């Protein structure tokens, strides 16, 4: 399962509740994109969330 290289965000799991309070499993997935960034001075392709890209936590190479 893919995980954000910068923030560590990954798929979270929970329940979907209907009006009758029935429950089924569901998941929330972060919007991950594979991008090239500098890691220890070398370019590397890693999974990064779009939230981290928009906030400027990483810069593309």
From Swiss-Prot:
Pfam families in the cross-refs: Ribosomal_L28
Domain of life of the source: Bacteria
Entries under Gene3D superfamilies matching the protein: Ribosomal protein L28/L24 (2.30.170.40)
The keyword Ribosomal protein is annotated on this UniProt entry: yes
Organism: Ligilactobacillus salivarius (strain UCC118)
Keyword Disulfide bond in record: no
SUPFAM superfamilies: L28p-like (SSF143800)
Any GO BP annotation: translation
GO cellular component: ribonucleoprotein complex; ribosome
GO MF term set: structural constituent of ribosome
Keyword annotations from UniProtKB, A to Z: Ribonucleoprotein, Ribosomal protein
Family according to the record: Belongs to the bacterial ribosomal protein bL28 family.
PANTHER family: 50S RIBOSOMAL PROTEIN L28, LARGE RIBOSOMAL SUBUNIT PROTEIN BL28A
InterPro entries: Bacterial_rp_bL28, Ribosomal_bL28, Ribosomal_bL28/bL31-like_sf, Ribosomal_bL28_bact-type, Ribosomal_bL28_sf
Protein name listed in UniProt: Large ribosomal subunit protein bL28
Region listing for Disordered, in residue ranges: 1-26
């Amino acid at each position: 399962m893919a995980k954000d290289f910068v923030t560590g965000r990954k798929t979270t799991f929970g329940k979907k509740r209907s009006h009758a309070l029935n429950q089924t499993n569901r998941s929330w997935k972060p919007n991950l994109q594979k991008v090239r960034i500098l890691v220890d001075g070398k370019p590397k392709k890693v999974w990064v969330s779009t939230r981290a890209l928009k906030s400027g936590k990483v810069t593309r190479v």
